[in-house]
């Protein structure tokens, strides 16, 4: 228990405490320079960083963008993941371990590498399949870029969520299925009336993790932004936070970046809690 507690404190609690502390400070000139500038020093600014973050229109625009992205991507990914899990849990598929591994492999690919691979597939000059699509197809146009990113993350995380559903399905007593078959239920009826209702908890977990992951969307837009300057450095909240930290966006530094990150965590938590409460109310109805 002690090693776990030490790791929990070092890996989880300490970064949160450091981030909270940093959010109340900003780097300002000391005033000791020849023209009043001088060395940058950490100065306590109270809630100023949070006020700046909360009133920054670019932050809320990027947040609205990822919320729209989540509304497009999460339902599709969860539906596909559940469908694959139901298929692997049935007696239709032989060698389910092989299929399980093949579906999970995209998740094992590092995020940046996967994003670069999709950038290659989306680039007209080098893509092997774009020449076969209708002329004018552009996966990186302003009107299609969210769908393109949704496709990238769905490819990556469907296998991961499939394993969550499959673990829940395999925990269901097989006696329930046998009893249903004796009563004349078809495979489809067993799936819809027994399996799907019993994996509601797994679905809740998968959606909550997806919501949190969506707020942190970073790899895909960063890689695509390198080839599409119109996206800007604040296309997603995570990009805005990172570029604020790196001095690409003003006000910059660890203080404003920490305020953005804590605001993102608060929004992700609120969205997750609201979804969980809605699902609980639906389950009690």
Question: Where are each of the predicted segments found?
Answer:
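A structural signal for multi-pass alpha-helical bundles of membrane permease subunits
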Residues: 1-285
């Amino acid at each position: 228990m002690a090693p776990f507690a030490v790791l929990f404190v070092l890996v989880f609690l300490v970064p949160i405490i450091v981030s909270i502390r940093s959010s109340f400070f900003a780097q300002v000139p000391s005033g000791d320079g020849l023209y009043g500038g001088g060395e940058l020093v950490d100065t306590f600014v109270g809630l100023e960083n949070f006020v700046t973050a909360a009133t920054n229109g670019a932050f809320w625009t990027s947040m609205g963008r990822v919320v729209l992205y989540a509304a497009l991507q999460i339902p599709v990914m969860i539906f596909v993941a559940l469908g694959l899990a139901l298929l692997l849990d049935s007696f239709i598929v032989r060698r389910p371990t092989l299929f399980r591994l093949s579906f999970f492999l995209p998740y094992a690919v590092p995020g940046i590498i996967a994003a670069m691979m999709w950038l290659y597939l989306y680039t007209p000059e080098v893509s092997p399949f774009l020449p076969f699509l209708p002329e004018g197809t552009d996966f990186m146009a302003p009107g299609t870029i969210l769908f393109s990113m949704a496709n990238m993350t769905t490819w990556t995380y469907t296998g991961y969520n499939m394993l969550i559903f499959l673990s829940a399905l395999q925990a269901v007593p097989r006696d329930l299925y046998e009893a249903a078959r004796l009563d004349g239920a078809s495979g489809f009826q067993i799936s819809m009336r027994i399996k799907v209702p019993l994996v509601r908890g797994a679905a809740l977990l998968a959606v909550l993790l997806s919501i949190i992951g969506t707020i942190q969307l970073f790899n895909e837009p960063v890689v695509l932004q390198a080839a599409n300057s119109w996206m800007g450095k604040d296309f997603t909240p995570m990009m805005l936070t990172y570029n604020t930290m790196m001095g690409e966006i003003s006000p910059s530094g660890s203080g404003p970046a920490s305020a953005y990150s804590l605001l993102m965590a608060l929004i992700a938590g609120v969205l997750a809690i609201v979804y969980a409460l809605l699902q609980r109310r639906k389950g009690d109805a």
